[in-house]
Amino acid sequence: MARGLNRRQIGVTEEMMATFGEIVLRMSHNHQIREGDPYREKDWEEIERHREPMGLSDAQIAERVGLSRNQVLYIRTLMERRRFRTGHYVRLLDLGGGKRFRTERFTPHLDHFRYSEDALELRAAMNYPPDQARDYVEKGWWRNETQRRYLERNAAERPDAPAYVLPGRTLTWKEVRDTAERVAGGLWQLGLRPGDVVAVQLPNIPEFAIANLAVTWFGGVVQTIHMPYRDAELQTLVNHGRSRAIVCMGVGKDWSAAQAALDLQPQLPTLRHVIAVGDAPDGALSLDDLIAADPDIEIGHEPSAADPHLLLYTSGTTSSPKGVPLNSHNMLSNARMSAPEKGLTADDRILTAAPFTHLYGLYAFHLGLVTGMANLLLPAFTPPALAESIEKMRPTAVWFAPAHGAAMTAAGLIGKHDFSSMKMCLFAGSAAPPAMLHALQEAWPGCRVCQLWGMTELQAGMFTRPGDGIGKSAVFAGRASPGSTVRVADPETGAERPRGEEGEIQIRGPMVFPGYLRNKKANETAFTADRFFRSGDLGYMDEDGFVAITGRIKDIINRGGVKFNPQDIENLLSAHPAVQMAAVAPVPHDVLGEQACAWIQLNPGAEAPDLETLCAFLMEHRIARNKLPEKLVVVDEFPMTPTRKIIKGRLPAPAE
């Protein structure tokens, strides 16, 4: 019993020591600078002001920093031992029961769970520079906020308010909280523990919310998998994430994710459980059975904000997907600080056309948690389904990708449906043609059309605010989100570019991820020396700090040694009356090295223009002749990511 708890039982890594050690030591150390006698005078404001310099308790530090009390105790003890050469024992003595020992509350130390090696490796990936972590904590950007805490707050303060809404089906915050706790208990009975990864492949339905909140209830990590992915992607992502369970759809019409996961289990050494929503194939568990689990199962662990709680993968439009570990410090602080700047409160109703398996959709999910507002659910996007959902469900805020707006416009739905409930809408995921945003703002006069720039690695990095006006919002992706710093730099030298000049967009802030999981090569080039994340996006910043996205570094076309960005060509082609969407990318050329090829998807019923006609259209808009596309491909439908971004690597090759 006297052996206490060791590092594997507490979940402390050397990387965590490096990030939080100095912060914990400084907050715990008594600096003896007490002034006056506020305690005798009962001057509560002065007492609070003196609290930190006088030294905080481990519990107070845990609440401030976003760690568990035991983690703070361990880190403090080890830091004092290293700094002051004290003889403190590095194991923690945990007798249970608080002030008095109680046999029924005591768990023998050998019976405490231990974080798995995979869980510790994932925790070690959450490695932030100590000076940045200290800055974020001191400014209140990072605090001990978790999905479970927000869920319990909403259930206590707004028990009967809607949390997740489908036509004909509404779950209140109390129902979600109670159901998530039961499912968490069922997962705990299956042997899942803090730090274990659980893959979730579900559409935007209430079961996604239940699974997500249940896994993170006890400190598990949610790994999202997009709905279009099949066996090959499933095997790759579950293997890399080392997932111990997957929650997915059961028996389907043309494909069963649950059956595919069962069939792949021999090639997935960490996958122990397949949990199906709907009809479960033989060998799979049913989510309904977990929902019916014993509500009194005791889970002896509550997560903290520093714990990893998401494992996402980049969309892989130009390369293989990369694993992105994220915690509540990143995601929930970003949502909490962004909500008031968007004017969002508990009285709003948000609908996202983007899937919850993508960070853009999760941004709406997180905003719902931190504000207490309802998420209106669209399980699968089609232009009519989105337009009808807005008309019938009456959201006040809607998340679009530019392709969603283009598809609804091409289908003639903008003038046919009632969009008057929207007070603000957001466009993100790819570059939005300014002409389309101006047209939508004119069609929706009571709604403020805004843009957002984000990535899997950082959620919402920049956005325009509702008060910025369409003049800014149609052209610019936004200005820095709260707490972040954005700059535009030379991609090769790293020197900051003057206002108005194009360069790489780089960002630093409390929402930025710490680095890719098990990908040393990618991490070597992901950050600058002063820890700005290199986005790979090109843009320029105006005098007011607004940033316009002009393309991707990898999309630059090098025609005979002359380099140019094709995004302005894409925007103009998308404005052609016959064209719904367009993409321009380089193709090999024997003499020039590269030349531009245009791919277009036509509006319904439109006749395909030839290359000469399109080039004449571009010349009318004073495009330089060397930028004109020299190849043209008409496609029936573009290959798209789950957030409706064109995957240029999968475009068909032009004819010779």
Task: Tell where the protein language model's regions lie, with residue ranges.
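Structural core segment of the AMP-binding/adenylate-forming
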Residues: 110-115, 190, 217-289, 604
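Conserved pre-ATP/AMP-binding loop-to-beta segment of ANL
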Residues: 144, 159-160, 281-282, 292-313, ...
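AMP-binding/adenylate-forming catalytic core of the ANL superfamily
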Residues: 229-239, 246-250, 398, 509, ...
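Conserved AMP-binding/adenylate-forming core of the ANL superfamily
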Residues: 142-143, 148, 152, 160-213, ...
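Gly/Ser/Thr-rich phosphate-binding loop
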Residues: 370, 395-400, 409-472, 485
